[in-house]
């Protein structure tokens, strides 16, 4: 008689190399705060009472700005056919951002070419499985959305230049990063070649959007 076979579930190896190191590298994002102006102003009753008392009973109203909540991170995966093999990496990235605790919310979106060839987004890697919306939905004038685009930078949106224009549009409002899954030796063969350098944060409250790149000699 043959021996009984007992199936065992073995966790798959992570796709992202050194996830703990990646988490540590992302910790500075915990200090990110949107630089937008307050959306509205309300009366600060406590400060008004204290100021009025110091003024001898003359009412001296004090107002304070009310801002939106903490920043969110939106992870946007290029859904071109060459990116299908990186689906699990995208899921792992979501877990890392959720565990980081730096953002109020972690939003996952997929980038597709629209009927006119431009950028559209949806909640599914299959363009037919969920409604397609204009990529303008990724923009937030309050600056509270940090964007991470996951792409090999070789699909149709990169060949047409639409992806580059989307990055430029988003980077005017808040930090944007591209996570390139291909080996570094292949980066300059893509539609988004790189220049090595040092990234420095700008000074003051708007520093997160005033990044300076100094090229390596």
Across the structure, where does each feature detected by a protein language model lie?
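Hydrophobic beta-strand segments of well-ordered beta-sheets in folded domains
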Residues: 73-75, 106, 144-151, 173-180
């Amino acid at each position: 008689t043959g021996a009984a076979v007992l199936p065992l579930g073995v966790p798959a190896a992570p796709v992202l190399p050194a996830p703990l190191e990646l988490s540590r590298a992302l910790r500075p994002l915990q200090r990110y705060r949107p630089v937008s102006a307050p959306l509205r102003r309300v009366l600060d009753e406590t400060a008004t009472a204290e100021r009025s008392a110091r003024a001898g009973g003359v009412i001296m109203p004090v107002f304070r700005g009310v801002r939106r909540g903490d920043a969110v991170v939106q992870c946007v995966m290029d859904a071109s056919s060459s990116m299908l093999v990186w689906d699990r990496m995208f899921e792992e990235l979501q877990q890392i951002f959720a565990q980081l605790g730096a953002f109020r919310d972690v939003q996952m979106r997929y980038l597709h070419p629209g009927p006119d060839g431009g950028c559209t987004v949806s909640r599914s890697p299959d363009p037919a499985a969920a409604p397609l919306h204009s990529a303008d939905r990724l923009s937030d004038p309050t600056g509270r959305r940090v964007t991470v685009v996951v792409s090999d930078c070789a699909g149709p949106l990169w060949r047409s230049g639409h992806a580059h224009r989307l990055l430029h549009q988003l980077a005017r409002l808040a930090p944007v990063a591209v996570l390139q899954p291909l080996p570094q030796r292949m980066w300059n063969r893509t539609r988004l070649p790189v220049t090595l350098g040092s990234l420095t944060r700008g000074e003051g409250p708007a520093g997160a959007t005033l990044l300076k790149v100094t090229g390596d000699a």
